[in-house]
Amino acid sequence: MNNPLEAVTQAVNSLVTALKLPDESAKANEVLGEMSFPQFSRLLPYRDYNQESGLFMNDTTMGFMLEAIPINGANESIVEALDHMLRTKLPRGIPLCIHLMSSQLVGDRIEYGLREFSWSGEQAERFNAITRAYYMKAAATQFPLPEGMNLPLTLRHYRVFISYCSPSKKKSRADILEMENLVKIIRASLQGASITTQTVDAQAFIDIVGEMINHNPDSLYPKRRQLDPYSDLNYQCVEDSFDLKVRADYLTLGLRENGRNSTARILNFHLARNPEIAFLWNMADNYSNLLNPELSISCPFILTLTLVVEDQVKTHSEANLKYMDLEKKSKTSYAKWFPSVEKEAKEWGELRQRLGSGQSSVVSYFLNITAFCKDNNETALEVEQDILNSFRKNGFELISPRFNHMRNFLTCLPFMAGKGLFKQLKEAGVVQRAESFNVANLMPLVADNPLTPAGLLAPTYRNQLAFIDIFFRGMNNTNYNMAVCGTSGAGKTGLIQPLIRSVLDSGGFAVVFDMGDGYKSLCENMGGVYLDGETLRFNPFANITDIDQSAERVRDQLSVMASPNGNLDEVHEGLLLQAVRASWLAKENRARIDDVVDFLKNASDSEQYAESPTIRSRLDEMIVLLDQYTANGTYGQYFNSDEPSLRDDAKMVVLELGGLEDRPSLLVAVMFSLIIYIENRMYRTPRNLKKLNVIDEGWRLLDFKNHKVGEFIEKGYRTARRHTGAYITITQNIVDFDSDKASSAARAAWGNSSYKIILKQSAKEFAKYNQLYPDQFLPLQRDMIGKFGAAKDQWFSSFLLQVENHSSWHRLFVDPLSRAMYSSDGPDFEFVQQKRKEGLSIHEAVWQLAWKKSGPEMASLEAWLEEHEKYRSVA
């Protein structure tokens, strides 16, 4: 057995030895403390936001950020205003950044925008899910198109931001006041260029920059970020799962959201040299060409222009030295070897004069586009070619910054240029120089307008998610009326039917004048009343409640019925007005045209006009002309009914008037009776209720020579607005509306419609129209309209929308369920009717028709829903 004392001695010696050894744990902690882990948020200068001043307090700078409403187009006056801002308002030597962001996060906007075009009934949830999936899938990928048509048509939302910061370490009160004044000056200058702005606060800032930095290619919904007032802004802009890897030719960005990993590839391209020519109004064609839609950038991107206005004295001195050197060389043998030296000397001489007089300034600028796509080589190659080709079409040569993608990516973020990044760009030789007017033409400020927050989803030609709501009050429209013209197959009916459905779903009513059964299917599917013109029965006095308000309208109706060609004069109309009032006062709603004729007969035989042969002659003429509408007259059965065909409880009424076309006198009488009925119903219903009257084939229904018809239409179209009423008039050709050949009624409808939609036109007729009226359309508009295709061939309708002075180009895509609902094809109509007879509801019948006509598409939408819908509620 060992000695216990030896064991104790050994233990003590071990402890002493251990105490003499160096402290390895302390050394490890020291090494860990010295290690610097790479963290992207540390590169960002964002720190705090001053609520009182609206300024951002960064690490070494102080600045502001504005969101601007993109302008739909531009002209020379806007460019001159921007040039003036650069020359006279912007501090020298400090970067200003303009960011145009094409966002894929449109999920919320789609859902909100479709709320008035949603399905109702027992199948509403299932139907709305399919319709929503149709547009969501288009935003994630692109709209389905026929084989061979490879156009990048998707859904995006464009936003413009302007950021500026200047060095300020102490953030003194003087610096803050100076920056506040600069914000006011910049905003006023932009307003002078028709660019409306609003300031970006801290919450909006972390949402915007968070979207710029944390791109998830699988997400369609913006992430809800909660502002933490106790944390620096730079940490709140970067996701915890953010994983950025730098490659030679691109960056990869990894994120983890809702239990799923995503990886995006970030590509950058910057301007290689000054373009030979550039116009502000054409800048949007760089990312989406109107005439060549295949030259479009469909992936999300950020187009950034970073500019610095150089010191005027230094640039003027530089121009002087350059001019004197070149002017001297141009007078020596040097010019024989380099003939261009004379031209250069002249250009520098002109530049120094402009700089000396303050007419121009020299601006250094860097134009870069940052694109986001899925992380695979095939997709990245397509994106690269789309970007390079789109810009090259307009004379912009872009290059990829090999080994410098991180640098270029940082330039698309606010306030980064002011931290010293622009200096690095200059040292790298990628900054261009140009005069202020030329740089103003490069500003990424032009993009399409989303129009209204909700309505008919009709994306623009540049893929901007847009909605059309004719009852929206923010479009500077003076009324809610719409004029539509397009040849057969252009998609007129498919465009109007969703508008009708939205009015009905909102609780309003719609009346359609049709010639050709185009709305019969929709009427049946919506539970409306379908009436043939031959069965219509009227009474001009049936719906009158106030004779003082309605007497003149009834008089006008009877005047046109008596003389469709407008041969009655003021005396005729005065006598007729007396007859109308007397008939109403005697029998009220039971009055008939017979009572009007009886009054005229009694007046003709009375002693009052015994000595007035001219008046008696007029009375006799009206008696003869109105006799055909009395109870025993040719058309008496149409206008003397005790029970008129039209009842106020019908939400939708379609009137097929094709059978009356060969009887123009009867047709005009019926038209007037219908319009008066609709007017009276508008007046008698609450003003918050939407009312719609669609006049299809207006070129046939409004082709009357009587000027009274035009006045009648004009008055009705003008007064409808006060009662939330709208008239939609549809013709085959713009000549039917806006030409010397158009009837007064058609011209009145065109002139009193704030909304004008022009679809595909007959090529021959449209060319002839442009020769006769060369100022009606701009050359670009003629070329665009000339390229419109047939709706069935390209699976969408193309149209020009004009709202007062605003013009925009749109496409209308319709989901398979809506296509089935609106289809007027004979076999489709019979299919639905047969299913209804079998006991199916209208929605079940439409569902089966959609699967019958578009089975693969319906299957793909259901599969998409199954994969993505579970993440929708989380988002």
Curated annotation (Swiss-Prot):
A GO CC annotation given for this chain: plasma membrane
Keyword vocabulary terms for this entry: Cell inner membrane, Cell membrane, Conjugation, Membrane, Plasmid
Localisation: Cell inner membrane
Organism: Escherichia coli (strain K12)
Protein name, entry field: Protein TraC
Domain of life: Bacteria
SUPFAM superfamilies reported in the protein's UniProt record: P-loop containing nucleoside triphosphate hydrolases
Pfam family, one: TraC_F_IV
InterPro entries attached to this UniProt entry: F-pilin_assembly_TraC (IPR053155), P-loop_NTPase (IPR027417), P-loop_TraG (IPR043964), TraC-F-type (IPR014117), TraC/Conjuga_ATPase (IPR025955), TRAC_dom (IPR045978)
Reported function: Required for the assembly of mature F-pilin subunits into extended F pili.
Gene from which this protein is expressed: traC
Topology in the lipid bilayer: Peripheral membrane protein
